[in-house]
């Protein structure tokens, strides 16, 4: 069924499809180092800690890059900002295939992170303006499915190609292929993003300042929730190939379809979750109830399955990994939609820049912590249990701290005290 047939026509089916494909490319290009990890580590003589640093280093530039990316998304045409970022990250991916040592790989991972940092602030700005609340679940479900299919295809196709051609050739091919996305995107008619002059004419020049955004408890609770949830994503994204090969004895060719299946299940769940949430809203359910149900249920499923990964045999671990995929698929579209709902069209770029900046510190922490745990204990169990504990904290953040998930009245917020008390839950 096409996007237009599913009711995304008002958002612009082509825009949503291209954003989803950009998210797909984004995650293929950031995740291919994890797929290449077993080969690259042996060829270059890297330790698990060094490999963890390479996997983490992407976020050293990606995470702080969210802040200027959010600012640019609201000051310039977000479509052009996204195109420039993709050009940078596609080039960095291709050049990685030519790297000969740890230092060069580290520099290219930093460049990749800087280019990819524009993806979500620009996408959220576009969707916050273009999508109504009743369309937001499906639009974000497709965006999340692109994000989650990226590792699926990257792990499956990339893993098989690396086993055949070697990791260097695959990086070059993927980088060049990524750049081809620019042609249809730049040829797409501009989305209905209001210009700065339009906002001024509409009397919205006093729409929220960055200081006003930073005063909201909802923002800080959302940042905590994102950190706790994305820790699991980045543990799996970074270490799944090594975990399957070293712990359970799978070959590179066997690992690829297993890893891809986890991500594909997650992507399918995200599309179904987005569709179901919109149907629930149209049936009369409140936004707060719909979003919180998906956020908390997703993290609850992930928690149970992470504990199972730490405790079970190979067969049980595969089932638990599949369950983690379902949990991530439940959680991710609601994460995206919640930020867009709370921030509204005039603050979505900066809000998501801040939230993604702080939330994605998990991408820095998870690969390194897991690598250290594996080096010291010889097993992944401790890494999975840390992720499970954080997922529980994320449930508390969404259930008790974030408050009601509904559009913030920024005009009223201008006169509010710092981090005001939130209304009762409902």
Model-assigned labels for residue ranges:
Residues 2-8, 192-223:
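Juxtamembrane intracellular "pre-TM" segments in multi-pass secondary transporters
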Residues 33-34, 217-273, 332, 336:
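Extracytoplasmic gate region of multi-pass secondary transporters
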Residues 45, 77, 98-104, 115, ...:
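Helix-breaking motifs and short loop linkers at transmembrane-helix boundaries and internal kinks
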Residues 80-94, 288-307:
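Structural signature of the two symmetry-related core transmembrane helices
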Residues 108-149:
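Cytoplasmic helix-loop-helix junction between adjacent transmembrane helices
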Residues 143-189:
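Helix-loop-helix hairpin linking two adjacent transmembrane segments in secondary transporters
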